[in-house]
Regions:
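A structural signal for multi-pass alpha-helical bundles of membrane permease subunits
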Residues: 1-241
Length: 241
């Protein structure tokens, strides 16, 4: 009965679509940006490389409440830095309710999730790129390969296991996005930031529908497993550390 109700409830499908949007946007952007940053800072000397790693990793180790406080101020309709900057540039003439407008709220959540998710992948990619066989890179350079060719033919296959790990972890974290929504929007406005995880929480601990929430949890676990298997099948190249 719970599963029958679940798959006929529009609110669940809205939460599922929001969750899939977060995953589809966050996973490739976090992976690509992390690899790009790691590629840029890996050739640096130890001091600047360590500095940049710390800078990008800082949001990942900062408490969620502290992160939310900072971003809530930045998104504030009247005193926030985003509206101030856009007004100063003449892009807008009226304040935007970033977290109170269904058109923008989900993108604000994705942006915050992105900034808190890139730290660990950057550190992992720096380590992976540092382990790439230098003799292969030097041989490619001697043969006249461009930096782009060297990256795609040598470095990219070498960091594929790290990319697989980053993609799976980012997928799981995106599906489990909850604290940001709980503290920033509570699923609103108009369920525009409702996710499957938050939908599960609401039904379990607000409406006390434990059986229904359990059904939501089972469906969420199956979806995460399917995404993880798909990523493993498409990205696993047999390369080992």
């Amino acid at each position: 009965r719970n599963y029958a109700e679940l798959f006929t409830t529009p609110t669940f499908y809205r939460a599922l679509l929001n969750t899939l949007l977060i995953v589809v946007v966050a996973v490739p952007t976090v992976t690509a940006f992390s690899l790009w940053v790691a590629s840029a800072i890996t050739p640096m000397h130890e001091a600047p490389r360590s500095f940049f790693r710390c800078v990008f990793y800082l949001p990942a180790v900062t408490g969620t409440v502290a992160v939310v406080v900072v971003w809530k101020w930045m998104f504030d309709a009247y005193n926030g830095i985003f509206n101030w900057a856009l007004k100063s540039l003449g892009i807008i003439d009226q304040n935007i309710m970033w977290l109170g407008d269904a058109r923008f709220a989900i993108w604000c959540i994705i942006l915050i999730l992105f900034t808190t998710s890139v730290g660990q992948p950057i550190v992992l990619y720096v380590a992976a790129l540092g382990n790439v066989d230098r003799s292969l890179v030097e041989a490619a350079e001697v043969d006249g390969a461009t930096k782009l060719q060297t990256f795609w033919k040598i470095k990219w296959p070498s960091v594929m296991p790290t990319t697989l790990y980053v993609a799976i972890i980012t997928t799981i974290n995106s599906f489990q996005c909850f604290a940001l929504i709980q503290l920033l929007t509570s699923g609103g406005p108009q369920h525009s930031t409702d996710t499957v995880m938050y939908y599960l929480y609401t039904n379990a601990f607000t409406l006390y529908r434990y059986g229904y929430a359990n059904a939501v949890g089972v469906v969420l676990a199956i979806i995460i497993a399917l995404f993880s298997v798909l990523q493993f099948k498409t990205m696993n190249t047999g390369v080992e550390y």
